[in-house]
A protein has these predicted regions:
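N-terminal "arm"/small-domain region of PLP-dependent enzymes with the aminotransferase-like
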Residues: 1-30, 35
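PLP-dependent aminotransferase class I/II
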Residues: 8, 20, 37-43, 47-53, ...
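Phosphate-binding glycine-rich loop
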Residues: 28-77, 91-95, 101-103, 168
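Structural detector of well-ordered beta-strand residues that form the stable sheet scaffold
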Residues: 54, 79, 100, 153-154, ...
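PLP-dependent aminotransferase-like
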Residues: 68-157, 164
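Hydrophobic/aromatic ligand-binding patch that stacks against planar heteroaromatic rings
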Residues: 91-92, 145, 169, 186, ...
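Conserved active-site segment immediately N-terminal to the catalytic lysine
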Residues: 155-190, 218-222
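Short beta-strand-to-turn element immediately C-terminal to the catalytic PLP-Schiff-base lysine
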Residues: 179-180, 194-199, 239
Length: 367
């Protein structure tokens, strides 16, 4: 079986270093908000060219805590994409605000700024662009809208650690950015984790309170908070992987280039597009085809794993029926949900594996 993501293979390359780090944590006797967490936060802030990084328990909490810390809640609207993982909208609902969806660009799969502007109302407080699959969103246009209408911008960068937009790292392009360290992410741990990056010191202070029960000092609280802390063990693992992220992302880009080289002539497949002023880090390599089911079945028969991202747009989810969206409201997003699928992509793919994947895709073209 050729796996969509091969975490076992990937972690074998850092296993000894991780075990050494875990042993250090065990010996320290300090397992929550210790020196490893502090070191990770400082290194990520420096890498992403921001002044603050606040680690939390997972990427979803990163979004929820950021929205709450920015004062977004009941009666407010936040614009985001309907073509993404559920947490992007769920976090908005969790703080009592209303998610408002805008359609996406058919080539990058990210928010279409022109459609975003049509959705802005007097209740709109923020925009959450998602850097989907590792492709940076149109941040200049989104930030321009935010400035024009006095809105906040929260980057959902959960799939995009290491992506670059016009020379600037994703995670430094809005009022705050949220990352996930779920195991399958480009920078992941052996469990859950997340981090929020910002250059707003007051926001970072509020986030640190929120992640630890609203604590100002031990046993004293000035607000209702959460229990959302990154464990020392996960921070230690992430420090090891942080040293590998440039190499891993570079390998992903190499595999992506190779897919594009050999599949570019296939009329039944539309390949992901990388904008010239951006660095896509291919968290997933998703191709588009009106023959999706046929191609996926051929790959399954050849023991090649695939995945559909995402089969149901968020505006059509049962839980959001009350928002009164209908099929056809976001035609680009809805067509992607019917045609897009992911093929294997990870740093330790091999040429022979990739050649086999490419051959199956090419052999099963046509009607």
């Amino acid at each position: 079986m050729i796996n969509l993501v091969d975490l076992g293979r990937q972690f074998q390359h850092v296993k000894d270093d991780i075990l050494h780090e875990i042993e250090q944590v065990i010996d320290s006797g300090n397992y929550i908000l210790g020196t490893k967490v502090e070191e990770l936060e400082k290194k990520i802030a420096k890498k992403l060219n921001v002044s603050e990084a606040v680690s939390v328990a997972n990427g979803t909490d990163a979004l929820v805590l950021t929205l709450e810390a920015l004062g977004i809640g009941k009666g407010d609207e936040v614009i985001t994409t309907p073509f993404t993982f559920f947490a992007s909208a769920e976090s908005i609902s969790r703080v009592g605000a209303t998610p408002v969806f805008a359609d996406v660009n058919p080539h990058t799969f990210n928010l279409d700024p022109s459609d975003v502007e049509k959705r802005i109302t007097s209740a709109t407080k923020a925009i959450i662009p998602v850097h989907l699959f590792g492709q940076p969103a149109d941040m200049d246009e989104i930030n321009s809208l935010a400035k024009k209408y006095d809105l906040l911008v929260i980057e959902d960068a959960c799939q995009a650690f290491g992506s670059i937009y016009k020379g600037k790292p994703v995670g430094s392009l809005g009022d705050a950015a949220c990352f996930s360290f779920f195991p399958t992410k480009n920078l992941g741990t052996l469990g859950d984790g997340g981090i929020i990056t910002t250059s707003n010191g007051k926001l970072a202070e509020n986030l640190r309170k929120l992640r630890a029960h609203g604590t100002t000092k031990k046993y004293y609280h000035d607000r209702i908070g959460y229990n959302s802390r990154l464990d020392e063990l996960h921070a230690a693992i992430l420090l090891v992987n942080l040293n590998k992220i440039e190499e891993w992302n570079s390998k992903r880009r190499d595999w992506a280039d190779r897919y594009k080289k050999y599949l570019s002539g296939a009329s039944h497949i539309q390949l992901p597009k990388e904008e010239n002023d951006r660095k896509h880090i291919y968290h997933l390599f998703c191709i588009r085809s009106k023959q999706r089911e046929k191609l996926m079945e051929a790959l399954r028969a050849a023991e090649i794993q695939t995945g559909v991202y995402y089969p149901c747009c968020l505006h059509l989810q049962e839980v959001y029926k009350n928002l009164n969206y209908q099929k056809g409201d976001f035609p680009v997003a809805e067509s992607l949900s019917k045609e897009l699928f992911a093929i294997p992509m990870h740093p330790y793919l091999t040429e022979s594996e990739q050649d086999f994947i490419i051959s199956i895709l090419l052999q099963n073209g046509g009607n």
